[in-house]
Regions:
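Catalytic cores of RNA-modifying enzymes
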Residues: 1-207, 253
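Peripheral terminal appendages
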Residues: 1-2, 29-32, 42-43, 226-258
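Active-site catalytic microenvironments for nucleophilic, acid-base chemistry
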Residues: 24, 222, 257
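An accessory alpha-helical subdomain
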Residues: 180-188, 192-228, 235-238, 243-249
Length: 258
């Protein structure tokens, strides 16, 4: 089938990596798995083979009949539910997800940040995310040093792990860069007592990264005011630190979140 460039479609076809993604999710038979962008159903097959009850959201209307035909038996049995739409705009309740679930997906690079944010910050977040993303993005999220807005936005909700590099040749059509399997576990919104605390944290982080070449304290002077020095000392942050050198624990301390 002709791939849609506008949807960033690169379908994974290598059996080894398909199995590795499904195995990384540690699926218990009967467990509900939300698959974003099932494409032609290669990963879907691997998930169903491990006993998952798959709920799939596909944006490309041309693939809906393909998937319905391929998984007609599973649809009849109720182990595969297919919905047409944009996963970023779809409410979980609209696709029948109310309890515990996992997210497994080979997602277009251009929606990586938005999709991760959606499923980590839900009132009822996924228990884990296994995502195929751009290699550089996975490295940036999972590394322990040199933080970014994206890495902190993930780590404040869960624990990311870089699983394995997936070479561009494993896809059709092949993308211009390599990909990687990213596993995010132990997901919780419990760090934030309310929406105000959550907003305060992200305002602080985004302001801190506003001008990367400047020292963090300079970026936060207006926001923190006269208390900046005392707050930095309490959080254990060096006066000349840059935003990327500050750990999640220090950011939380700076935001008054324990």
């Amino acid at each position: 089938m002709l791939k849609k460039k506008s949807l960033g479609q690169n379908f994974l076809h290598n059996p080894y990596y398909l199995s590795l993604i499904a195995d990384t999710a540690s699926i218990v038979p009967g467990e509900r798995v939300l698959e974003v962008g099932p494409g032609e159903g290669a990963l879907t097959e691997a998930l169903l083979a491990r006993g998952a009850k798959v709920v799939a959201i596909e944006k490309d209307h041309r693939l809906i009949p393909v998937l319905k035909k391929k998984f007609a038996k599973e649809i009849k049995k109720g182990t595969f539910l297919l919905f047409e739409g944009d996963a970023l705009e779809t409410k979980l309740s609209a696709v029948g997800i109310r309890g515990t679930y996992k997210v497994v997906a080979n997602i277009p690079y251009y929606i990586t940040g938005a999709l991760i944010k959606k499923f980590l910050s839900e009132k009822k977040p996924a228990s884990s995310l296994v995502l195929l993303v751009q290699k550089e993005v996975a490295q940036r999220i999972a590394r322990d040093k040199k933080e970014s807005i994206l890495s902190l936005s993930v780590k404040v909700y869960g624990e990311p792990k870089y699983v394995k590099t997936v070479p561009r040749g494993a896809f059709a059509p092949a993308p211009t860069v390599d990909s990687a399997i990213l596993h995010i576990q132990n997901i919780s919104v419990g760090r934030f007592k309310d929406a105000a605390a959550e907003q305060k944290f992200f305002t602080l982080v985004k302001t801190g990264f506003g001008q990367k070449r400047k020292f963090l304290k300079r970026n936060l002077e207006k926001l923190l005011g006269a208390n900046a020095d005392a707050m930095f000392e309490k959080a254990g942050i060096h006066p000349n630190a840059r935003a990327e050198d500050v750990s999640l624990a220090q950011w939380l301390n700076l935001a008054g979140i324990k």
